[in-house]
């Protein structure tokens, strides 16, 4: 007579197999890494309760919007960066790239805010299709020039935030930079992925990195 109940050992083997399978699936689809470091990115649009974040989170890093285009300076940049530092987070600053503005003007704008704010992580350039015209003959050369200016100033290639994989496809220079991808199921097809933006919680973008130590500036 056979029993409809599995023995204890068989249960353990089956459950163990399911767990391993889920972990493998998660790994290949970008949902699991052996160790991941959680972070957020913020701008003046976000009302951030830093005391609450300090009390209830396991965050390791924070990226703060500094500038956009030629003249826009985020009014909360310095405050956000210093508050993030105060609660023990590593901090990076990012610039929102505009295709219709010369690279040098954008770099000078970013540098002026960078001096005033706190940062100990590699700076980032936010490259999004929304509001930008990448069919403009000057757009790609401007971005390439801006990447070069960042590299010369900070001694490393900037992180490139891309709103979609289509940006990566038509700008091959991205492959030489660490990438910050938004809501992409699998990071395995992009070898240089350094940060993944995975969710939005309470109007704040949540990110994670498999190795945040590699994103630190050498000072």
Locate predicted features:
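Structural recognition of the beta-strand scaffold that forms the well-ordered cores
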Residues: 38-41, 60-65, 91-95, 121-127, ...
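Catalytic domains of cell-wall/extracellular-matrix polysaccharide-remodeling enzymes
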Residues: 121-189
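Alpha-helical scaffold elements lining the catalytic groove of polysaccharide deacetylases
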Residues: 46, 102-115, 132-149
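Boundary/entry segment of secreted carbohydrate-active catalytic domains
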Residues: 26-68
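Solvent-exposed loop/turn segments at secondary-structure junctions
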Residues: 44-47, 67-72, 97-102, 129-133, ...
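Acidic (Asp/Glu)-rich catalytic clusters
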Residues: 49-58, 76-88, 110-119
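N-terminal Sec-pathway targeting helices
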Residues: 2-21
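Functionally critical loop-and-helix segments that line ligand-binding/catalytic clefts
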Residues: 34-44, 50-52, 172-219
């Amino acid at each position: 007579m056979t029993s409809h109940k599995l023995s204890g050992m068989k249960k353990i083997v089956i459950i163990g197999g399911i767990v391993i399978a889920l972990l493998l699936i998660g790994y290949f689809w970008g949902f699991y890494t052996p160790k991941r470091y959680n972070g957020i990115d913020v701008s003046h649009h976000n009302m951030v309760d830093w005391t609450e974040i300090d009390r209830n989170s396991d965050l390791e890093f924070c990226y703060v919007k500094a500038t956009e285009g030629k003249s826009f300076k985020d009014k909360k940049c310095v405050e956000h960066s210093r508050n993030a530092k105060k609660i023990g987070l590593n901090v990076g600053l990012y610039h929102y790239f505009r295709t219709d503005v010369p690279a040098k003007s954008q770099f000078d704008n970013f540098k002026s805010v960078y001096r005033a704010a706190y940062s100990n992580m590699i700076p980032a350039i936010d490259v999004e299709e929304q509001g930008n015209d990448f069919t403009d003959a000057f757009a790609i050369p401007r971005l390439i020039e801006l990447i070069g200016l960042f590299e010369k100033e900070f001694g490393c290639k900037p992180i490139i935030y891309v709103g979609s994989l289509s940006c990566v496809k038509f700008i091959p220079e991205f492959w030489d930079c660490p990438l910050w991808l938004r809501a992409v199921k699998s990071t395995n097809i992009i070898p240089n992925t350094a940060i993944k933006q995975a969710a939005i919680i309470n109007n704040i973008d949540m990110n994670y990195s498999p190795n945040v130590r590699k994103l630190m500036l050498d000072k």
